[in-house]
Amino acid sequence: MLAVLGNHDWHANRRDEVAAALAEGGIDVLERDHRILEVCGAELGVAGTKGFAGGFDGAHIPDFGEPLLRAVYAESIREAAALDAGLRAIALCPFRIALLHYAPVTDTLEGERPDIWSFLGTDRLAGPLREHHPDLVLHGHAHAGTFAGRVGEVPVYNVSVPVLGEDFWVFEMTGAARAPSEVH
């Protein structure tokens, strides 16, 4: 089982403690990393990173101003670069998933107050998704958001528990269409 940490996991500098507890339970935390797994005889590549805040077209946090604001910008750029590197590393896998915490698209933020969207994700994460076309993108964080969206032709799903109304959701990866189908 794979996971990425979210903002609550990082709160109060408890990242290592949370990751260790997950590892004890057999959960591998991806942090600017990737894994290639064999599932039913086929390779499944997963690129995982937290992502970060940063805003969307017309409302990006810029690389300008106070050092703390510029640090937010820099972190969003580092996370997008990590996603790009992870997707490059799994490019030859027949099935590819991007696993994020923050949203890469506003489609899945509908339902949240628009004035907080910049804190819920950034479309800087969408660039690597458009370039590498993973089969499935999963994120959380937007607890009042919407389940499904897209980055171009790439399906994006907000799988936060409040949005799902369930503890988990099952996606079936089909080889013929190279697109996930819901199996809920």
List each model region and its residues.
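A short, acidic, amphipathic alpha-helical segment used as a generic capping/interface helix at domain edges
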Residues: 83-90, 121-131
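Acidic/His-rich segments in extracytoplasmic proteins that coordinate ligands and/or metal ions
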Residues: 2-20
